[in-house]
């Protein structure tokens, strides 16, 4: 750029004042100088002495403006002819003026010198007031370039060619500026003028010549008290308000401050009215006013954009109401974009006078130089001077003047970047401003930014700064397919409104000059909309209203919403005048004239609207070597080093400039005068040309390297590339008015494979923050990710810089000239008359009163309807005035003071709201919210906002509930990790209160759920005396309300996981997104979990979320079938009773039905791919911690013997059915961790009878503990009520514990997780595959599936998980047959859409599966367990606990002795509970009366004995009972993990016997499937110990081996979980043995004995009846282990069949007979297994006895030896 240097005599005074400091006093321009002579002293060189003759300057070029190329913004400014012409008239100096200017120059120089090193007091007092004016004006271009100023274009200065071209443009603009009036007005003072471009590096910027107090002194003449400390303090106090509220900062106040005063003085008479109105505002009134305005100007360094009112608060307070009162647009007007919502007509009118005064104020690197002499420039100037102390430079003035309270920078530094005044640094961890609740809960803006920024913009969420257009066409709304890229921010995309909706279409343009607003332009268009069913044809008017302000009113208004005397909906339409008068009543309609219909008008309007849009950017790159930091050093690096070359190669392509046809950024593409090559690239349709310092021409004899600086110094954004060892960068070292943003990139390990880069950013303080945010403490590897990140940062940086004062002012002036040109030269004489061509009609219409607009018509507008509200800013703990906008796509909040978006979310993300009389809380996403208060006197706005939300979102009004606990302290529902209700206990207190499956908890006891982890959620529900919750009801189908981005993100991540984790057999690994696949009414519950892909912190939640997807996966089922045997057995019983019930359980009921089922249902669905589940957890990574804990806890329970599960879990990949296994694996792997939460699951299982504690660990476990039964107490109560009877029993209990884990609200992920943990802890897990099979079925089943190593086992396991999942998902009215469960899993996953919820549980336990289970004799116990599971659902916790105990005993313990009478149907929950009470926990934990303690449920009067008999006897009964239980008892009976958990909780890992492990699961399983119980009946307990369990084992044999597989089979689903526990050596309890409750159980011994007998006699029948659904013809005789496996496999293959079986539990006579035969065979096998187990146990007992005897002998021997030693020592002592 070219700089104007004063004539020789201009700097005379400077010599005297600055001579001491000057180092370069050459008469001619110094080779390295590009600044005016007058400023050499400041820049480090000295001006020529006073005595220097004019001859010295004769060699300089003439004062004419040099013809230098215009670049960048300056180039655009130069192209603004209208403004230039107007300004030129005023700026042409006269000779006399020149003379005055010379004199003035001397004074100015001296003043500068004073600023730079002399005391301010030395400044002449006469120049005080003028200096003050200059001060304020320095913020404006006009002031800075006054004629009196040495460098003023109007002065007789010789142009310096050394300046960058950037100044030329600015100089030209300045020349055009009205400098005369200022110069003339203040002839005695040097007129202020500012420099642009690299020249700005000079510290001498306009006013900076004086210190702040100097100015005050000078101003004393006008206001003696201006300098008073009190006044100053007051002014300062006001200023802050003005800064923060009045205007963005520098922009509004400075521009409107002092400059206004001067400008007002120079205003023409035409402006007297405006002047008088704003005198007080401008400080023209009293001296005080002047002071305030001055201070405002001085301190206001913020951009106008920050403040809605450029005048500033101070001015506003004194200004007329119209200036201070914000303009409110009609509510029926739908805004097209964000900036339209900020349109303020009063502000536009108030700023009319100041527009001309708001000259190009400096910002960015030059911000220090102009308005507040940025420290950056000051420091750089001082640096160049060397002798000057930066403290005495204009920087000091800036600090004092601009912000009396600031500006020292932000004290934010690191090894890349130092803090700098007037600059703001971003070194990592910063986040954009957001007023939502979660942002405050997360911590400081920098907190948790890393996670937030890991992929800053690579998500469906939009950053606040990227929100522009609010009215989005349907085809573009929430486009899931759109690529995820970093958001481009700070772009006014709404500027294309005219291009997209008006150009080429019929519309009308009107121009005119309003007396208040000045030139205005209106575009209006009428368009047809879809007809309304009730209101007929619909039309809307699209309107664009432009004023000189950059903010434009764009939007539309429905014809029906417009008051008019004309009929709506006609082809003719309304008079345009009516629409405009309604929308903009303040506009003088009569001044408008129709625009000429010429291409020029359209072209001009497009330029006017889109002047801020640019897709071409030029960016500078400076190379900083080790030990360097200064601008000069960087510019003088002649060649690029290898590290720099490597960086350039990554950043873009090196192109040859000669002949280059794309964007060249002012580089010479013809003669190579600017270098031969440059760096060019593109990103998201943006072209970027880099000005690389080493590629630009190098001048050896010019240290300033002007040929390089002329380009880089004029770039708004500059990248500083630092080699290792470079000194930290500071903008103080850069001298440029245009460089506003510096992006520092430092390379680490350059030119190696480990090369990486770290970043930091510093921006001018009046430039808003921009993204993508830099992760805290993160380095970027050399990759396209880093390249994209950096390019997005560069583009956003330039966009943000354009909002700074300088560019804002330039754009405003340009816009004003465009409008003026249109209003004067492009209009016709046709007015916009309401009558128009219908004069007669209009005359008559005038007499008519305008009809009111149709109420609520605007509610259906696509644009954003806006309301003024007060929003709670949780991050800052304050309330801010905002505009709420709700369009068809977004809900946004705009801060009126800063004029920025402070919140946005998709309408599809809104899930609910809580309205009050004058406030409203809007919930979105996972329960986060914003809190709004209606403006005073606008209470009706809340009603309108609610109505708008109903129209545009899928949310619903929240419901407050106070939940009661039952006798066991249970709440009666399960909660998933994301706060959605997995299941609700039928007829429980929660159910009675209106809680339904799919409901979403957003607040618990006044605590926002979004801030709670799953564990915390459960603990809060467990421990709160009074549980008050705020819930958002689900959709009609029971699906939870979820945010669209959440759903999309989860879906996207889940599929990824699935594909990534796909395991052999076509099943995705646990990570796989199986849950996504599942889709069905029932699965809706799980689906949400799936959506969330929450790591299922509560294993329960995870499985739910993933189960859905898994459910569809058939391969998982297939793998499950083997495991299905046991799982089938375990779920068979429950499902037999609950198949129909489960199916028919509505989505809402499903939750209740599946207290445990939700988890299991999910699991059932998800079980198809336990591995998927594991994979899913990855998508849910954010929740993994919880997932780990809860999952582990539930995993423990569910993986009950998951110690082996770990290994098995790996197997589970083949048998992905076990979602739990993923967690189970975790628990197994972590062991202690799993055990930690298992207790939780136990509680959970207890909580919800329906919860399949093991089968559905995810939901039941945590959920149960949390809500279902307040499982915390439940699980604890389980422990309390039931004490492990035997080690084996405790082992079973551990599985139950897994179910107990259920106590965690949704920890139920792994019902058997606790047991799994115990198992994991126990060495027995050695045979994980066996235990997994068993465990898997019963809630451990999932885990089992996850952990079973053998495919068969996996299949078994997966079925078990299915059972759990099904139970969980569908009120585990699991089919009685355990085999059904595994197939159900498989089937569930296929059928899942519906089954996932209720069928899920059922599907989880398909008839086939159950048959298989029953086929496996060992499963009977599991079936009984399943039966208990059902029981637990319908029965109180106590029942479940008892049942689980019973089942466990039956399965693992007493099974061997006698098949426990199948409580499978458990029609009478009480009976079942009683029977199981002791069995489950080995203690009379649950009493028949305990059921009463449970939440209210349908009561079944049958006694336990009757129930057992029914279960045993009924072929039909199994199914019937399933129905009964399914309706309520079954569901209630269906135990979630909570029941199982209870059992497991009691049992210890040491009880790892398959039976005991099984029992825990079986207890759950009992509720889920009867068949499982028969399997369980077999001594599955220590299968792991002995590799060959009874018949059950054979079926598992494929996976484990005959002995072990059989045991596994025998173990059944619950056994699977137990088996995992057993994976350590576990013993199978004789399924024939029925666990007996303790006397304290409250059971009648006679009833128990009868039940036991019935169980023994009818065990086969029970199994069959329970298995009926599962054993349906699809399941071939499951009697043989292999058959069981096969049937299980079939189950998975025919998921629906499985569910159908469970549904069809009642078979025809032939089918029943067949089932009975199969069951008999299975029973026979079970008996054989039991016998084998007995033999094994006997041998073990013998071995233990031998060991005991040996140990005793050794102990005695040791004692004897010790005695002898003692005697020996005593003797020696005596002798001594």
From Swiss-Prot:
GO terms for molecular function: GTPase activator activity. Its main location: membrane. Residues 1715-1769 form a coiled coil. GO terms for biological process: cytoskeleton organization; epithelial cell morphogenesis; establishment of epithelial cell polarity; eye development; hematopoietic progenitor cell differentiation; regulation of small GTPase mediated signal transduction. The modification Phosphoserine is found at residues 94, 140, 394, 1358, 1538, 1541, 1614, 1617, 1672. The modification Phosphothreonine is found at residues 1381, 1694, 1698. Pfam families: Rap-GAP_dimer, Rap_GAP, SPAR_C. Residues 960-1024 form the PDZ domain. Keywords: Acetylation, Cell membrane, Coiled coil, GTPase activation, Membrane, Phosphoprotein. It is found in: Apical cell membrane. InterPro entries: PDZ, PDZ_sf, Rap/Ran-GAP_sf, Rap/Ran_GAP_dom, Rap1_Ran_GAP, SIPA1L_C. This is Signal-induced proliferation-associated 1-like protein 3. It comes from Mus musculus.
